Amino acid sequence: MSRQWNFLSNHGLIILHLVSNPRATLREIALATGLTERAVYQIVRELEEGDFIDKRKVGRRNAYTINRRNILEHPAYGDRTIADVGKTIMGLD
């Protein structure tokens, strides 16, 4: 029996979801990614603290902006940014 695995981490799934759906609620993100709302809440907080996303209030909802110029801090990535990864995976400009 083979184990199921994801190509992207949960953090990556949430970032990619927010690229297309910047005003998604935590519940909507959870439903789209298959994660619990609690896990999504924690990951969104970590992404904010790591300066990967910015959150702002729009009416009664939050809207998220991806910091596309944020450099990924890992030797394997070199100077690649979130935008570079998005272009590769989703064909983003």
Q: Which residues make up each language-model segment?
A:
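Short, cationic-aromatic polyanion-contact patches
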Residues: 3-11, 25, 57-78
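Pre-recognition alpha-helix immediately N-terminal to the DNA-recognition helix
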Residues: 12-16
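Short amphipathic alpha-helical elements of helix-turn-helix/winged-helix folds
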Residues: 17-21
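Alpha-helical residues within the helix-turn-helix
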Residues: 28-31, 48-49
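Key DNA-contact positions within bacterial/archaeal DNA-binding proteins
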Residues: 38
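Short, hydrophobic-biased segments on the C-terminal half of alpha helices
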Residues: 44-45
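A short, conserved structural fragment
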Residues: 48-58
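Amphipathic alpha-helical dimerization/coiled-coil segments
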Residues: 71-93
